[in-house]
Every structure is written in structure tokens, then in C-alpha cells.
Amino acid sequence: MEMKQISETTLKITISMDDLEERGMELKDFLIPQEKTEEFFYSVMDELDLPDNFKDSGMLSFRVTPRKDRLDVFVTKSEINKDINLEDLAEFGDMSQMTPEDFFKSLEQSMREKGDVKAHEKLEQIEEIMEDVVEATLANQSEAADPSTNHESEPLDYVHYVLDFSTITEAVAFAKTIDFSIEASELYKGSNCYHMTILLDVQQQPSYFANVMYARLIEHANPGSKTRAYLQEHGLQLMLDGAVEQLQKIELG
């Protein structure tokens, strides 16, 4: 098992199929939430060396994303105190008229409002991108199977991405996660944040490659709020080439 801390309130735990098998679990066990699944999650948390801010943090939510050869579990802690007070419960209305499902939906919404909303939004963005990838892959397979739908299109050779960071420390931490080849990278300073551009070579890659890479990038960054053209004209240029490589050399305290 591997664990990464995505933000102050979100962890990503990668569990291999072998790990699942050793614990008597299968992918189908995660299709319908049940007590067995919850016990598995907490047993995994007990085994890992959790960051201090996750220990005894109260309420946790788990989001499961099955992969071909593993299971990705995103764990988000709530900023709500471990003991929910009566004022919190009063916000839910008449609980006697709620089904258990409605109650937990209301509770989850309350957690989102009082917890790390940005982390939830980022996870949803990643999930939407991956859903688009699956749909595009199925569409391509369908077109390949039906010659009448084939048509010539000009493939992209390179794709530029723009990412935002609140602090330079976040940009350095992001750079250290890059373990794949990139063609170029730049760093700009905006009025209230830092912006990084990433250029990827997508030649000889499948059509969904660009979306998959974008999903990987925003695991540790925020989607860009400016275009590269805007930054070139209005941004303060800090590193015009090799920004990722230069930031990787910086040691974080």
C-alpha cells in the first residue's frame, strides 16, 4: 500500500489487488457500502503512518476509485469536531422524517460546507475527467470497429496546461511529484498566486492521453485561472524554461 497527502485534509491511499486479496476483500465489496467495507478502511488507516493532523481527527469520508490493477481511496477529514453538537443537527430539519440515506446525505453536505470544499471539488474534477476518458475510449473503439465512421483528423503534437498555486512552496511540492517526461515548463507570478505552464508531447499517444495527464497534474495543483498567452503578456516571468527541474532542486524544510 502507498499513501500520499494531497492536501491538509485529504489523503490518497493506493491499495494493490494483492493487498485486497490478503485481507479477504474483492472489488465488488466496494460497490455497496457495508460494515465490512468500513472496517477495512479503518484497519488500513491503522496500519499506515498517518500525518499527525489525521490522527484522532473525528469524522472521515472515503471516496473509492477502482483501477485496473489497484484501488485508489481518497480519505477526507472533516473540520467538524468529533462530537456533533445539537446546533449542527438542528440544521438538518426533522430527522424523524428522514431515511438513513437522506440523513447521511445531509450530513455529508454539512461536512462539505464546513470542511475542505476545495479538496472535494478537486476530486470531483478528477473523476469527471476520468469519466470523459472512459467515454472517449469507448467511442474510439466503436469507431475502429465500424469503418464507415472513420475520418481523418489532424492530431495534436503538443498540449499546454496552466496550473495555479497559492504559494511557491506548493509549486515546489508539485514539481517533486513530476516523475514523467515533459517538454517545457514556465513559472509566473500573478497578483495573488503563482502560475505554472506545462508542455507535454502527445505525439504517438492515444487520444485520451492528454486528459489522463491533466487528471494527474491537478491531483497536486489547482486548475489554471489564466491562459498562457495572458501570462506571457501580463504575468511576472520568474522561470522561462525548466521551471519543474529548477523547483525540484529546492529542499523543503
Swiss-Prot record:
Transmembrane segments: none annotated. It comes from the Bacteria. GO terms for molecular function: protein-macromolecule adaptor activity. HAMAP family: MecA (MF_01124). The N-terminal domain probably binds unfolded/aggregated proteins; the C-terminal domain interacts with ClpC. Enables the recognition and targeting of unfolded and aggregated proteins to the ClpC protease or to other proteins involved in proteolysis. This is Adapter protein MecA. The lineage of its organism: Bacteria, Bacillati, Bacillota, Bacilli, Lactobacillales. The gene is mecA.
